[in-house]
Amino acid sequence: MAHKKAGGSSRNGRDSAGRRLGVKKFGSEAVIPGNIIVRQRGTKWHPGTNVGMGKDHTLFALVPGKVQFETRRGRDFVTVVPLAQAAE
């Protein structure tokens, strides 16, 4: 009798899609209110002046202006310099 032994099932072959995290607007780029600046897990970057933080730690602009990255007290902050000041 021609029988074929049952094939084993593989335990590999699956992976999750990338989460598209990272910096979306870099230093000195122009932003408008609501623009996402950084998507992150945890607070690698902290919100500075004129920057808000969502419940998933996403940083976003609160005013129109230019993005600025800076380090204060050993932490990395993202701030938005308002257009009036950025023009000066």
Swiss-Prot record:
Keywords: Ribonucleoprotein, Ribosomal protein
GO process terms (BP): translation
Region (Disordered): 1-23
A Pfam family: Ribosomal_L27
Gene3D superfamilies tied to this protein: 2.40.50.100
PANTHER family hit by this protein: LARGE RIBOSOMAL SUBUNIT PROTEIN BL27M, RIBOSOMAL PROTEIN L27
One of the record's GO cellular component terms: cytosolic large ribosomal subunit
InterPro entries the UniProt entry points to: Ribosomal_bL27 (IPR001684), Ribosomal_bL27_CS (IPR018261)
A GO MF label: structural constituent of ribosome
Name of protein: Large ribosomal subunit protein bL27
Family of this protein: Belongs to the bacterial ribosomal protein bL27 family.
